[in-house]
Amino acid sequence: MSQQAAAVTKVTFKVTLTSDPKLPFRVFSVPEEAPFTAVLKFAAEEFKVPAQTSAIITNDGVGINPQQIAGNVFLKHGSELRLIPRDRVGGISRAR
């Protein structure tokens, strides 16, 4: 293992799937320099939901722009995030 590979700094995220009533979560570590789009795709694959129609938000409900690196997201928003399929965003439940 090279010294350069050993020096890679990682950040750890706990991602919860909000569309499941049981609120399952996954914890994973990624390189600090990883594009957050890759984190979103990986999290979506872990929960078997389509990445193209999913978003990651904070526990406070703030949307996260995926066009940044994982380290910046970690510094701005912390480690606890939520994965939400976009078909659930702004949806209105109508009882008939």
Swiss-Prot record:
A single BP term in Gene Ontology: protein ufmylation
Short name of one Pfam family: Ufm1
InterPro entries per UniProt: Ubiquitin-like_domsf (IPR029071), UFM1 (IPR005375)
Residue(s) of cross-link: Glycyl lysine isopeptide (Gly-Lys) (interchain with K-? in acceptor proteins): 90
Record keywords: Isopeptide bond, Ubl conjugation pathway
Propeptide: 91-96
Statement: the UniProt record of this protein carries the keyword Membrane: no
Matching CDD domains: Ubl_UFM1 (cd01766)
Keyword Nucleotide-binding tagged: no
Family stated for the protein in its record: Belongs to the UFM1 family.
Job of this protein: Ubiquitin-like modifier protein which binds to a number of as yet unidentified target proteins.
Record protein name field: Ubiquitin-fold modifier 1
Organism: Chlamydomonas reinhardtii (Chlamydomonas smithii)
Gene name per UniProt: PR46a
